[in-house]
Amino acid sequence: MDNMTMGAKNNRAVNIFVVMLCQSFQTVSGAGIAHFLPSIRSNLNLSFTQAGTLSAATIFSYALMQIPAGYLADRYGLKRIFFIGVLGTTALCLTFGLVPRYWHALVNQTASGIFHALLFQAGLALLASWFGAQRRATAMGLSLVGIFAGQLLINALGPWLVEHFGWRFPFISFGFVGILASFIYLRLGQESQDTQSREKLRIADALRLFRHRFMWVCGIIQYVRLGVMQGIAFWLPTLLIDEQGLALQVTGSIIALRTLLIAPSNLLGGYISDRLKRPTAVMGISLVILAMTTAALAKVNDVALLIALIFINAIFIQFYFGPLFAVPVEKYGTHMAGTLSGFGNFFANLGAFTFTYLLGALKDQTGYFESGFYAMAGACLLGLIFTVLLEGMRRH
C-alpha cells in the first residue's frame, strides 16, 4: 500500500511538473515582443499603434477561442488539446523570429492566440484535476507560476541574447526548446482519473452560461483583471525605456524582478482564499491597491519611487487570479472547469485587447502613457463595484 501511495504521489508530481514546464512557453512570445519592442519597431519600421496591434491581434484571437477551447478540452480530452496548444504556440514563437515585415508578424501573432487558448484552457483544467476541491484556487493559481517562469527567463536572458545575436534569436531559441517540451509532455503526461471519468459536455451546456447573471459579473471582473495586467505588462518596458530613459539591460532586470514577484503572490492569493473561504475579499483588496498604484505610475518621475510602485503593483496584479477562476467552479462544478475558465477568459482577453490597443493609440495621439494608465485605474474601481455585487450573489 505504501509503495502504491508513493507511486501515485510521484505520478502526480511528474504530471504537474510537465504541465507547468509546457505552460512556461505560453507567453514567452508576447513577453519578448513587449521587452524588445524598441528593437522590433526599428527593424520592422512600426508605429506605436502597429506595435500595439501585435499584442492586440494575439489577444483578440485568444479571446474568441476561449469558450471553444474550453469546450474542446472538456469534450475531446485535456491531454490531446493541451499538446496541440503547446506545439502550435512554440512553433509560432520560433517562426516569429523569422518574420520580415509587419503583416507577417501580425498573421503570426493572430494564429498564436488560437493555440494559446488551447494551451491555457486545457492546462488550467489539468492542474485543477490533480488537486482536491479544497485547494482549487491554489491549483488554478499554480498555472500562473509556470507561465511567469517563462516570462522571467526571457526577461532575464533575453537582453543578453539580443545584445549578442539580435532580437530574433530569443524567439527562435525559446521556440525550439518549447517544441521539445511539447513532446516530453506527450511522452510523460497523463490525465487524472477525475478527468477521464467526466461526463462529456454538449455545446448547449457551454452556451447556456450566457444566460447566467452570475457569470456576466465574473466576466466583467475578468475583463478588468487581464485588461490591467496586459496593458501594464506590454507597455511598461516602453514606458521605462522611452519616457524614463532607462537602458534595455536595466529595464530587463526590473521586468524580471516584477515577474518574480507575480508568481508567488498569485499562489499566496489562492492559498489565502482557500484558507479563509473569502475569495471576494481577496479580489476587492487587490483591486483597491491596483487602482492606486496604477494611477500613480502615470505621474511619478522619480525612478526609485517608480520602481517601488511597479513592485507593489506586481504583488497584487494577479493576487486574485485563483479566487476569480475558482468562484464559478464552486457554483457549477468541476465537470465544467474547462468551459467555465474559457467563459471567464473570453471576457478577460477582451479587456486585454482593449487596453493594449488603447494605450498604444493614446501614446501616438498624446505622446505619453498618462491617460492610458488613468483609464486602467478607473477600470480597477469598476471591478471593485462588481466584486461587491458578486459577494452578494454568492451569499444568496
Regions found by a protein language model. Give the residues of each.
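Helix-loop-helix hairpin linking two adjacent transmembrane segments in secondary transporters
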Residues: 142-189, 235
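Conserved MFS/SLC helix-loop-helix module at the cytosolic interface between two early adjacent transmembrane helices
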Residues: 64-103
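C-terminal transmembrane helical hairpin of 12-TM major facilitator-type secondary transporters
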Residues: 279-327
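Extracytoplasmic gate region of multi-pass secondary transporters
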Residues: 33-35, 213-266
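Cytoplasmic membrane-interface "Motif A"-like loop-to-helix N-cap segments
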Residues: 75-85, 274-287
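Cytoplasmic helix-loop-helix junction between adjacent transmembrane helices
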Residues: 108-147
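Helix-to-loop junctions at the C-terminal end of transmembrane segments
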Residues: 65-77, 266-277, 363-364
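Paired small-residue
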Residues: 88, 92, 103-111, 304-312
